[in-house]
């Protein structure tokens, strides 16, 4: 669990691991943290993470409502979009959407011009210009996977943010499709 996902600081997180499970060391050295990650603990960040985890700052129910509002909005204005993943397995703050007939890189630039942050994939694949291996594993074609964007919602996201994103998406997708044809 990354602290920043619940309103805590960047660079700190938690790993829950059964004692019987062995994983290779991330950092070698003094043997702290069951020899998985050696080094001095960042006590202030740990305390801030704990405070964030206990606070009402990150409310999964509210964030799920924003996500669901976004899904309802984009499927209303763009009925051809595909919402990826099973509804029952969705995380509160993440939606991955396929926009048929577009290229995700083009959509990303057009959304950025509207001051809307989204991504062509997970944070760990940022800067990689390949189809999402997750979408490919889910059975999507290469073309479909390269027509997808990931939208994330967090504690600072608002209904106004959702409404604005939904309002600009039809024009962004139209322009993205036109660029894809040229």
Model-flagged regions — what are they?
Residues 1-182:
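Pyridoxal 5′-phosphate
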């Amino acid at each position: 669990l990354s602290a920043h996902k619940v309103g805590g600081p960047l660079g700190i997180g938690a790993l829950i691991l059964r004692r019987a499970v062995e994983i290779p060391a991330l950092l070698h050295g003094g043997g702290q943290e069951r020899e998985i990650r050696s080094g001095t603990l960042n006590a202030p960040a740990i305390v801030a993470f704990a405070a964030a985890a206990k606070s009402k700052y990150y409310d999964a129910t509210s964030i799920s409502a924003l996500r669901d509002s976004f899904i309802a909005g984009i499927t209303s204005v763009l009925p051809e979009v595909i919402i990826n993943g099973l509804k029952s397995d969705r995380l509160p703050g993440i939606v991955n959407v396929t926009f048929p007939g577009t290229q995700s890189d083009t959509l990303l630039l057009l959304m950025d011009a509207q001051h809307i942050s989204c991504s062509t994939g997970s944070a760990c694949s940022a800067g990689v210009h390949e189809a999402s291996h997750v979408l490919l594993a889910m059975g999507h074609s290469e073309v479909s996977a390269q027509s997808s964007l990931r939208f994330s919602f967090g504690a600072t996201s608002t209904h106004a943010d959702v409404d604005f994103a939904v309002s600009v998406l039809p024009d962004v997708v139209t322009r993205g499709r036109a660029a894809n044809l040229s």
